[in-house]
Structures are given as C-alpha cells and as structure tokens.
Amino acid sequence: MEITFENVRDIIVETLSCDVEDIKLDTNLVEDLEADSLEIVELSMALQEKLGAGIEDEDLEKIHSVQDILDYIKGKQG
C-alpha cells in the first residue's frame, strides 16, 4: 500500500478511535488526539501491519504529528 496522508490518517482514525475530521498534517498525536504512549506503540504496529512501515521503538519519542509520521516513513523508504 502506498504511503499517503489519507492512508496514514485512516490508520490513525482506526487505531485511536478519533474522527477523520480531527486529523490534519499538523495534528499532534498527544496534545490534539490525547494519545498515550501505549496508543502510540499500537499506532506504530498498525502502520507496520497495514503499510509495511512502522516506527522504530527508539524513534517513537521523536514522532509528534501526522507530518512527522509521513516524513519518518518516507525517509526510511528512500
């Protein structure tokens, strides 16, 4: 599956049980969506499962926004 904002957004909505309208590129996972550390790990696992591109455990603390997720995954791919 291609790495797009829409694909990542849909995984976030499914994993964090939030509204699709709440997800923008600058949406902060913790501050805006109130995700805790366990939910961030679950999100990384869902990204790995559905997109084949998760976030390394040691890098999770660097991920704050949806844009961070996209940049990280695209950076790892190419």
Indicate residue ranges for each PLM-predicted region.
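Thiotemplate assembly-line natural product biosynthesis machinery
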Residues: 1-21, 75-77
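Phosphopantetheine carrier-protein modules
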Residues: 15-34, 51-62
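Two-component histidine kinase catalytic core, primarily the HATPase_c
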Residues: 39
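C-terminal structural segments of small proteins and small subunits
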Residues: 61, 67-73
